[in-house]
Amino acid sequence: MVRLEQSIASSGTSLYTLMHRAGRFLAYEAKKYLEQKSDYRGPECNRTKNGESEWSKTNHNEPEHGKTTSGQNQFRAITPNQLHTATLTQLYVSILCGHGNNGGDGWVAADYLAKAGYHVDLISSVSAQEIKAEPAHTTACEIEHDIKCEIEHETERKITASPKNNQTIHLLINPTNEEVEASLSKADLIIDAILGTGFSGDAVREPFATWIELANQQKAREKVNEKILSTDHPAFNTRNARIIAADVASGFSAQTGTAANPCIVADHTVTMITLKTGLVQPSAKTYCGTIRVAPLANFDL
């Protein structure tokens, strides 16, 4: 996989650009699920007269290295008036990010989903500055900088009640287990961007092991819901969170198809560029769910 990425990079498509494509495709798949979940599909995906979505008409040019996605390469912006007048069902996305390039995909997806108007919690064990892998470090620093600028701008204007042009990302850096659980429990969708194709072994280290267990607990609640007829039941979870994994379910070996303890149990996996050996093993269905390949070398949505 590393050799394939290097080959693509040597042909003129940088790893930075590949990461932005991966994160964008991940957000696209997440957005499709969120649209299905909500009765309200949002002004950003209104249909034109010929049935074409506004999303499909949006400019998706690749970001230049060193530039963020602000003003370009994003879902169609939701205006303050649209947010104010629409009866928007509040949809929450929790994104679990590791400190490698798989986590970088999660940072990019968070940026797109927030700009699409969703409430996004980005959970990371380290700050953007502490990420050592490239291009995840550069990408996360750019997004984190934009988040801080947005917060400072809103504070200066003292806007606390008026709708904003874009939602911002709620960063949870090195959070407690209680904070992670609180975020996941309110999520409509959980994105797993913790461990990627480079993972191997039979155990996952902390804090990621606990994060995986907490995410899987939300799946267990969903199974309970299927057996509960009354929404007044104390065990009923109105969110019914699904899990989408970036590239491979965290804790699952993309090479061998074996699962570590613990391992994410995803509903859907967006794997980048090509199908990995482990993902065609029978065990992949249990941990990775349905699998879609994102053709990042020739990407056009």
Annotate each language-model stretch with its function:
Residues G12, Y16, H20-R24, W107, ...:
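Electropositive phosphate-/nucleotide-binding environments in soluble metabolic enzymes
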